[in-house]
């Protein structure tokens, strides 16, 4: 089966009477045009998107196939993240946090309750933890790409 476009969001579609299958797309795969995946029901799926996916991405709830019997949607699994918060009186350190994370080309998201979220790796955790007035905590979380701050999300390292 070949899926070549995003048909909409699962929560906005009427899927009654149809089986919903999910294909897992990791956060770092979301902006790739070509995938070969297996749904949670064992169906092999080829995904070949146009160039719009390079900036839009594939995310939780995106429907990539639908017929009268089955709907296939994207599932973005939780991943290790760093939740960053600023201690009282150190709100001005937000600019430094954003600069340092951006300088490493890492994705950055708004979190809950005045926090920021970025992808976990040990060098990033060490760097963020050294910034005065900043608390960093490692967690497992689903990324909400509607809350991304970064202009582009990609897996680029220096």
Residue spans of the language-model regions?
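Residues forming anionic-ligand binding surfaces in small-molecule and nucleic-acid pockets
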Residues: 98-111
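Short glycine-/aliphatic-rich beta-strand segments at the starts of folded cytosolic domains
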Residues: 74-87
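Short, well-ordered loop/turn sites that connect or cap secondary structure elements
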Residues: 55-58, 64
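Intrinsically disordered, low-complexity, positively charged segments
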Residues: 1-54
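Short amphipathic alpha-helix segments
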Residues: 58, 86-101
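Helix-rich terminal scaffold detector
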Residues: 2-20, 41, 114-158
């Amino acid at each position: 089966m070949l899926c070549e476009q995003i048909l909409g969001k699962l929560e906005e579609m009427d899927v009654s009477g149809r089986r919903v299958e999910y294909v897992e797309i990791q956060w770092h795969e979301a902006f790739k045009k070509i995938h070969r995946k297996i749904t949670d029901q064992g169906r092999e799926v080829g995904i070949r998107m146009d160039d719009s996916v390079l900036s839009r991405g594939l995310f939780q709830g995106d429907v990539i196939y639908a017929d009268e019997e089955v709907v296939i949607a994207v599932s973005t699994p939780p991943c290790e993240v760093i939740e960053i918060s600023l201690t009282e009186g150190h709100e001005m350190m937000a600019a430094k946090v954003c600069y340092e994370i951006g300088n490493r080309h890492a994705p950055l998201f708004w979190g809950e309750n005045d926090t920021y979220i970025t992808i976990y790796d040990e060098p990033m955790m060490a760097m963020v933890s050294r910034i005065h007035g900043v608390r960093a905590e490692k967690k497992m979380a689903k990324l909400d790409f509607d809350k991304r701050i970064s202009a582009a999300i990609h897996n680029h390292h220096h």
